[in-house]
Curated annotation (Swiss-Prot):
Function per UniProt: Cytochrome P450 monooxygenase; part of the gene clusters that mediates the biosynthesis of lolitrems, indole-diterpene mycotoxins that are potent tremorgens in mammals, and are synthesized by clavicipitaceous fungal endophytes in association with their grass hosts. The geranylgeranyl diphosphate (GGPP) synthase ltmG is proposed to catalyze the first step in lolitrem biosynthesis. LtmG catalyzes a series of iterative condensations of isopentenyl diphosphate (IPP) with dimethylallyl diphosphate (DMAPP), geranyl diphosphate (GPP), and farnesyl diphosphate (FPP), to form GGPP.
Residues annotated as transmembrane: 27-47
Homology family: Belongs to the cytochrome P450 family.
Induction: Expression is down-regulated when the stress-activated mitogen-activated protein kinase (sakA) is deleted.
Disruption phenotype: Does not produce lolitrem B and terpendole C, but accumulates lolitrem E and two other paspalanes, IDT522 and IDT538.
Biological processes per GO annotation: secondary metabolic process
Family matches, as Pfam families: p450
PANTHER family, per database record: CYTOCHROME P450, P450, PUTATIVE (EUROFUNG)-RELATED
Name the record gives this protein: Cytochrome P450 monooxygenase ltmK
Length: 533
């Protein structure tokens, strides 16, 4: 039912009947103005653009509740709205009202049909852009030029085996440079540690040495990602008509622009350096094995200066979407290890066994053999998702799309799934409320046909936190390797525990994003028998 539009029509009818039943001649002009203002306010509160979709709305407390109030409540009560919708309509479509428009939540049974649609019909990239603030997201370039994503998929992911040493080397550099000595029990804020580590490793994989350790580049890109995130959150938190004014008043947009200029200058100098070296030493020059080199080679030829600028913007856009989610996943995993301390020694023993077998070298095969850690990461992600919603898509076909059962989804609809609700459904996951760090390890061991399934970076209809199908998160394999290296090196070099009487940080929610106190500390101490990979 379209609650808002029905209410608006009733209010209009009652107002007109009231005016018709009285003599207009006896109505004071001030009363007319007040009545019109009341009418305008009611229309503003209750009007909703029809979606053309026959699906119920979750989150309404009554048919008379104004859509604007529901949209306001979504900012802080998205979790309960999504939970309510899934409980009532988990096998069918339902909708939720947000400031940026209504979104359609679909059940897993539609996923095969949806992910087989072409990007011209149903776009994953535009779904990502729309969900992160549209024109204010800072990632709109992805909709015009997807070379960064294609380079990550085709050049980086297939060559991760060659990048394992770089990941290990950069995290050890982070420990030596950014980490306290921890000779005795030392309080360490976990999330900032992971964010710094993930940023450093990402820079190494994306732009390589020496730029990845250039203070100008590191500081500018870190601030850029922070400001872009703040802008996205701010714009998602107000109605659309307020966004231009808010964007003008906030300090983050102009601070972000300054960071972009500084980062692009550093990146353009690096690209010019590489091109000059290639021209001078065309036979002896060894090209860098990083994302920047891949993007430079895959970019369409154009005017040199403009191409450098475009490539720089592509790299900054990729950097914006790369770091924070992986850092949060790592922090949650470490908190879960400490909260369920029996896993610390179990995972440490697995790491010792695996890496002693390969003479303490970090290899792709060794990371793949960390099956218990892989299971633990997947279970931690199930309990601590980075978003309550996922698999965002926008219908681009002007005629809309028709699903396998005949359901029609109109043009410009933003649709998604509810991964957290699905992976905590007792009909989908056995005993979903308990934390079993070996849940997926045991599933892989029980059935030989499941050996390649149920891994942290794989997706299926019961675990959709990375998306599903061809356009699932393109960086998930890199993120998996990063987290395994970071967590393994921490376990082998440090003892870790929580402060006395401290509890695991409890996540609240802002929109569909779980939030926790990022400064929550753990106690860490260098092990006497620490093992350096």
């Amino acid at each position: 039912m379209q609650y808002g539009n029905l209410t608006t029509v009733l209010l209009l009818r009652n107002t007109l009947l009231s005016l018709n039943s009285s003599s207009i001649c006896h109505v004071h002009w001030l009363q007319v103005i007040v009545a019109l203002l009341v009418l305008i306010v009611c229309i503003f509160l209750y009007w909703r653009t029809p979606t053309g979709i026959n699906a119920p709305f979750a989150g309404y407390r009554s048919p008379w509740e104004p859509p604007l109030l529901v949209q306001m409540r979504y900012v802080f009560n998205a979790a309960s709205m999504i939970r309510e919708g899934y409980a009532k309509w988990k096998d069918s479509l339902f909708q939720i009202s947000r400031y940026d428009g209504d979104i359609l939540i679909v059940p897993p049974r539609y996923l095969d049909d949806l992910h087989n649609k072409s990007q011209e019909e149903l776009s994953a990239i535009y779904g990502l852009i729309r969900n992160f603030g549209g024109s204010y997201s800072g990632i709109t370039l992805l909709g015009e030029n997807d070379v960064g994503i294609r380079a990550l998929q085709t050049k980086i992911t297939p060559n991760l085996a060659k990048l394992c040493d770089d990941i290990r080397d950069e995290f050890q550099y982070c420990l030596d440079t950014d980490f306290p000595a921890c000779r005795d029990w030392t309080s360490v804020s976990v999330h900032p540690l992971f964010l710094k580590a993930v940023e450093r490793i990402t820079h190494r994989i994306f732009v390589g040495l020496p730029l990845c350790r250039n203070p100008q580049w590191v500081q500018a890109t870190s601030k850029h990602a922070h400001y872009a995130t703040m802008i996205q959150i701010a714009m998602r938190s107000v109605p659309k008509f307020i966004q231009p004014l808010l964007n003008f008043c906030l300090p983050w947009p102009w601070k972000n622009a300054a960071c972009v200029r500084e980062a692009k200058n550093a990146l353009i100098l690096e690209m010019q350096r590489r091109r000059n070296l290639e021209k001078v030493n065309s036979f002896d020059y060894i090209k860098s094995n990083d994302l920047l080199q891949a993007v430079m080679e895959m970019s369409s030829p154009s005017h040199e200066d403009s191409q450098l600028d475009v490539v720089a913007q592509i790299m900054l856009t990729m950097n914006t979407i790369a770091g924070h989610s992986t850092a949060a996943s790592g922090a949650h995993a470490l908190f879960d290890m400490v909260s369920h301390s029996k896993y610390i020694e179990l995972l440490r023993e697995e790491a010792l066994q695996v890496f002693r077998h390969v003479e303490l070298r970090v290899t792709k095969q060794a990371l793949g053999d960390l099956r218990k850690l892989d299971s633990f990461l997947r279970e931690s992600q199930r309990h601590n998702p980075l978003s309550l919603l996922g698999f965002f898509r926008v219908v681009l076909d002007p005629a809309g799309i028709t699903l396998q059962d005949g359901t029609h989804v109109p043009y410009n609809t933003l649709l998604c799934v509810a991964p957290h609700a699905i992976s905590n459904d007792p009909d989908v996951i056995e005993d979903p409320t308990s934390f079993n760090g070996l849940r997926y390890y045991e599933q892989r061991c029980r059935d030989a046909s499941q050996e390649k399934k149920h891994q942290y970076a794989t997706t299926d209809k019961s675990h959709l936190h990375f998306g599903y199908g061809t356009w699932a998160c393109p960086g998930r394999f890199l993120a998996s390797d990063m987290l395994k290296v970071i967590l393994t090196m921490l376990l082998l070099q440090y003892d870790i525990r929580s402060p006395e009487r401290a509890k695991r940080p409890v996540a609240g929610h802002f929109h569909e994003f779980p939030l926790f106190n990022i400064n929550t500390p753990l106690l860490m101490k260098r092990r006497n028998d620490s093992l350096v990979l």
